Amino acid sequence: MLDHRTETFMAVCSVMNYREAAELLHITQPAVTQHIQFLEKEYGCRLFLYENRKLIKTPAAQMLEDYLSSVQQRENFLREKIKNNGLRELRI
């Protein structure tokens, strides 16, 4: 399960537009900006830049996107494996 900030990051990577990512996630554009700024501070680098009014990913953003995509795929695989093996019941 990804953190809401990393989900925001992945949405921005998908549409390459803060406003469209906000609409996709049903949050405000300033919230998207805050999430990206948090991640930039956390990792100590810029994730996106503007070139000629176009949003582009930095190399760090590409690395993070690749990593998070892998995490999402593995989580989906695990969910399916648990679902298909009938391991839904949690006993305490």
Identify the residue ranges that each predicted region occupies.
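Interdomain hinge and pocket-entrance segments immediately C-terminal to HTH DNA-binding domains
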Residues: 83-92
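Regular, well-ordered alpha-helical segments
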Residues: 11, 23, 41, 48, ...
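Hydrophobic two-helix hairpin corresponding to the core of helix-turn-helix DNA-binding domains
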Residues: 9, 21-22, 58-61
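Short helix-boundary/capping micro-motifs
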Residues: 12-26
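The N-cap/first-turn positions of alpha helices
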Residues: 2-8, 29, 61, 89
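A short LG(V/I)-centered, amphipathic sequence patch enriched
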Residues: 40-57
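Core residues of bacterial helix-turn-helix
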Residues: 24-25, 36, 43, 64
